């Protein structure tokens, strides 16, 4: 297995890179700012400069990677087109390139509540709408996929067990980014994770379960 992580310098993306490196899985990290990436990513990660909005740069970044993990997201800005460009157009470009390269598994970090049009987050330039459109594009692509919809993302880790459920079943809760990274990486080797949307939060009240059981329980 060789992984290409896109959105690798974001808060979730860098944790995905770290998780892959810890497991000795070779990583190519697609980054826009090489100097910044060198500061925050493990030296073991191979850094490739590119941009999901420049399709010609994506294929070279994926290269011989067998799996792609996408954790892109628009930076906070006043650009009303940012979610459309990054969450939809960029992901679409990435899916097309992954398909062309024969990638075996595509993991997308999305969000809870993407199916709720009137969710307050859609006040921010319809961000959830475009994430949902990206999900649907992946599902129709023919690629083997896992779509991970985390709850509110927290930078600090905790020991709370993960709660995993199917699409449009969890509507509140939060989860540490490190746990989201673990879910994404575990999905690569769990047959039960293939072609599923999984919603994830963490909860002190939940019971510990194996990864196999967590993914298997999602219909």
Q: Which residues are covered by each model-predicted region?
A:
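N-terminal Rossmann NAD(P)H-binding glycine-rich loop of SDR-like oxidoreductase domains
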Residues: 1-25
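NAD(P)H-binding glycine-rich loop region in Rossmannoid oxidoreductase-like domains
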Residues: 4, 8, 29-31, 35-93, ...
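Non-catalytic, hydrophobic alpha-helical segments
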Residues: 12, 68, 138, 148, ...
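Conserved cofactor-binding/catalytic machinery of classical short-chain dehydrogenase/reductase
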Residues: 54, 90, 134, 176-179
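Glycine-/Pro-rich loop/turn segments that contact NAD(P) or position catalytic residues
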Residues: 74-166, 172
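Glycine/proline-rich active-site loop of Rossmann-fold NAD(P)-dependent oxidoreductases
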Residues: 157-162, 187-196
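Substrate-positioning beta->alpha
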Residues: 171-186, 196
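Core catalytic loop region at the nicotinamide-binding pocket of NAD(P)H-dependent oxidoreductases
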Residues: 190-211
